[in-house]
Amino acid sequence: MLKKNKKANSNNSGATAYSPLAYLKRPYFKRSKACPLEQCPNEDIDYKNKGLLSKFTSEYGRILPSRITSVSSRKQRLLSTAVKRARYLALLPYC
């Protein structure tokens, strides 16, 4: 929200001036999230592991993005290929 000063502009147009602090951006702090599959070896991410794969899919059957699940990019690739294989073999729904 922009804060208005009570002073009028010097050109007497009747408009109010905005505070210069209103235009500064807030500092952005990126939170470091640990990968939930960090301790899980790559062999456990398999198309037959239906319980693990269902944690990373939505209720409509879509693969959740890594920004929501905080999975590393390597594990996200393994998850996506495993989910696609499980869908092809009818272990997971396409919905």
From Swiss-Prot:
Name of the gene encoding the protein in the UniProt record: rpsR
Quaternary organization: Part of the 30S ribosomal subunit. Forms a tight heterodimer with protein bS6.
Organism encoding this protein: Ehrlichia chaffeensis (strain ATCC CRL-10679 / Arkansas)
Highest taxon in the source lineage: Bacteria
UniProt-listed InterPro entries: Ribosomal_bS18, Ribosomal_bS18_sf
Stated role: Binds as a heterodimer with protein bS6 to the central domain of the 16S rRNA, where it helps stabilize the platform of the 30S subunit.
GO terms of molecular function: small ribosomal subunit rRNA binding; structural constituent of ribosome
Protein name: Small ribosomal subunit protein bS18
This protein's record includes keyword rRNA-binding: yes
This protein's UniProt keywords: Ribonucleoprotein, Ribosomal protein, RNA-binding, rRNA-binding
NCBIfam families membership: S18
Cellular component per GO, a single term: cytosolic small ribosomal subunit
Family recorded in the similarity comment: Belongs to the bacterial ribosomal protein bS18 family.
GO-annotated biological processes: translation
Lineage, top ranks: Bacteria, Pseudomonadati, Pseudomonadota, Alphaproteobacteria, Rickettsiales
UniProt keyword annotation of Transport present: no
